Amino acid sequence: MRRLTVFLAVLPVAARAHDVQAELASGPALGWGAEWWVLMLLALSLLLYAAGLARLWPRSHLARGRLVRQAAWFGAGWIMLVLALASPLDAAGSYAFSAHMVQHEILMIMAAPLLVLGRPLALWLWAFGAAGRLGIAAATRRPGVRAAWGALTAPVNAWLLHFAALWMWHVPACFQAALASNGMHALQHTSFLASALLFWWAVLGREGGTHGRGGAIIYLFTTMMHTGALGALFTMSGSAWYPLYGNRAQLFGLGPLEDQQLGGLIMWIPGGFAYLAAGLVLCARWLRQGPGPRTAEARP
């Protein structure tokens, strides 16, 4: 029984090692594209935003500048989503841990904050007619829905969810499960993006809320610290955490440990800088405007 267990554990690694020999000769299978449901959701999010913007534009004479800025933020975030989920980077993540880290960082520290700044919920709502907007608004005002949304977007809860998603999925058993299963991989990316959206909404979207900018700066700083700690663990480790990658990073000229160290550095340095930069921007705005944030910008 023990031999059977060891065989089953080693089988995926052996299969991938065999694949590498063929791929080293032919080159990695990289290209644009994604699963149909990913492409559908990307297209739907953009179409609804454009429809909402078109419907709201004639009614917003005094706020068109803000709408243009929000649309630019959303467009940039949407492009980052496409880059992370439908570009060759997605396929490269199955060959190299470092490419996978680039993909995750794009989702969490580029796409997510840009989408939050784009205020998509309001624009998506305006994509529907008056009756549809009233129906959706009535549904979201139900006590259970409001309580759930309030709990998810409470700054401490959003911070904890983002922390838990990041650390849980980098546990070797969980990360390798995502490598071995398309369903688990989709769940991993969904949890990364969803938790990052909640985190950035708590930091940026609720500006002027009870925690204020001081609290937002603390959440950004502590996130920089724990993500940097995880990146440092990858960088300084003397052994590979994810054997399922095997020698596939050789396709990009990297050994397994070099690939892992590069991935750790990507999470540690550029990833940490993004949280630091966001915190410094909020701090500068806080000092410029005074401790009382402008409540007019608190909601989409």
Locate each region found by the language model:
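Sec-dependent signal peptide recognition
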Residues: 1-9
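Alpha-helical membrane segments of multi-pass proteins
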Residues: 2-3, 16-300
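Hydrophobic h-region of N-terminal signal peptides that target proteins for export
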Residues: 8-17
